[in-house]
Structure formats: C-alpha cells, structure tokens
C-alpha cells in the first residue's frame, strides 16, 4: 500500500511539473518570442527549466552584471554604499533618467551606464578577471575594454549560470563582506506585498542581433526563496516589458510568486 501510494505521489509530482512546463511554454508562445527561464527553490532544490538548450547558452550579461559589479565595487571601496552620489557631467543621454545626479540605488534601478562606467574605472580593469573567475560568473573574453566588457559581448553568461550565481549571493557564500551584501540587497529591491519581496535586475544586450532581454533575481516568499533567470530574443524596445511580465507570470504559474 505504501509503495503504491509513493508511486502515485511521484506520478502526481511528475505530471504537475510537466503541466507547469507547458503553462510556462505558453507564456513565451503567446508573446511570440524565443526565450528561456530557469526557476529554482532555494529550500528544496526543485527546478523548472523552460527551453533547456537556450538556458545553457551564454549571452552578453549587459546590465545584469550590475549585481556582481555592485558587490565588487563595495568590496574594493570604489563606492561607499547605496547612498553613494554620482554627479552628472551634463552629457545628454538618450535615456532621460540618466541625465541627472544619481545615487547607487537609482543608478542600479535605471541601469545608468555612465555611473557604472565610473565604478569600473575606480575598480580598475585588472581586478575584474579574478572576481569573475572566483564567482563563476560566466566567461570573460580577454583582452577586454574595461568600461564596456559587460555591454560589448566580452562578458557572457547563461541563465543557468545566473541562477547558480544568485544562489551564492542569497546564501552569502561568495567572498564579500556582510555590509556589501546588505547594500546590494537594498538596491536590488524591486517590489513587495504581504506575501513576498522581489529582488531583481533587468538587462538588455543590444549589440547583437537579435538583441537579448534579461530579467534575473529572486523572490522571498513566506516559506521559501525562489531564484530565477529569464532571457529572451527581443525585436525592439517594445518587447522589453515582456521580460518582467513573463518572468512574473511564470513564477505565479508554479506558486513561487504569491499575489494574494
């Protein structure tokens, strides 16, 4: 009796996982985009991967590198914390939110490239290869441009590697100070309600065709932490909202993103 019960339970779990995959596949299908998402429970290790071949493929990290870059900058003393001020020099950028002074918190949230280029100059290009290797953050092709490498395709990472990296961030297993983790968590904060807190970063790799949109992060729910990394092929800027929309809908589909 016990054996048959366990078999039935195992079959139920398998069928549920398969249904969840189908539900998530429909999100990408309805949007008409090629993409992948990796979701993992920090507590149980339960994993869901849509489009496994793409999940293994590396793409330019783009602004998702700001997660690691923030930790590096804090550790190196290149910035002091989330209230660090970056003074705008008057250069007019195509993104209006960049055309003003920034704090680290605002720079992270609006993906201010010139702010993080200042950070890269303060850290120094020679420091980055060791940090990237030590944290297993994708692959850095050398030689590289010290203020462009996360944008120009020199630094690439897969969705699977993003989740593995985020796991180490959440568990604080990387060689960074507690204060660095604390500041990163503050700037990564994206949303909350009574059931969850969302920490995340977008990215858009535009120097390739098709361009690639990213959304990576984690959800702190009442009984678990769910890591996720999504990327998708974007046709133009009109596709960018799909990054967060599909990721949130996928997390909701498996119960990782409670809304009530």
From Swiss-Prot:
One of its GO terms (biological process) is cell wall organization. Inhibited by cloxacillin and clavulanic acid. The keyword Lipoprotein does not apply. Residues 1-19 form the signal peptide. It comes from the Bacteria. The keyword Hydrolase applies. The modification N6-carboxylysine is found at residue 66. Belongs to the class-D beta-lactamase family. This is Beta-lactamase LCR-1. The lineage of its organism: Bacteria, Pseudomonadati, Pseudomonadota, Gammaproteobacteria, Pseudomonadales.
């Amino acid at each position: 009796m016990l054996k048959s019960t366990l078999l039935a339970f195992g079959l139920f779990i398998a069928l549920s996982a398969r249904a969840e995959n189908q539900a998530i596949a429909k999100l990408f299908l309805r949007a008409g985009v090629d993409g992948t998402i990796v979701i993992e429970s920090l507590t149980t290790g339960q994993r869901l991967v849509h489009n496994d071949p793409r999940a293994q493929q590396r793409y330019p990290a783009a602004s998702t590198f700001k997660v690691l870059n923030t930790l590096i900058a804090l550790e190196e003393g290149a910035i002091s914390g989330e209230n660090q001020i970056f003074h705008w020099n008057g250069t007019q950028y195509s993104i209006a939110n960049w055309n003003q002074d920034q704090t680290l918190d605002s720079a992270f949230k609006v993906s201010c490239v010139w702010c993080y280029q200042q950070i890269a100059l303060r850290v120094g290009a020679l420091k980055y290869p060791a940090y990237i290797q030590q944290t297993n953050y994708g692959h850095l092709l050398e030689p590289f441009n010290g203020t462009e490498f996360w944008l120009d395709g020199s630094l690439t990472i897969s969705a699977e590697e993003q989740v593995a990296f985020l796991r180490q961030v959440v568990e604080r297993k990387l060689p960074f100070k507690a204060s660095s983790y604390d500041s990163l968590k503050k700037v990564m904060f994206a949303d909350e309600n009574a059931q969850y807190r969302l920490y995340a970063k977008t990215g858009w790799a535009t120097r390739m065709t098709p361009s690639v949109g990213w959304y990576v992060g984690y959800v702190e729910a009442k009984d678990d932490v769910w890591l996720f990394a999504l990327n998708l092929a974007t046709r133009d800027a009109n596709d960018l909202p799909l990054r967060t929309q599909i990721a949130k809908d996928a997390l909701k589909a498996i119960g990782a993103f409670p809304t009530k």
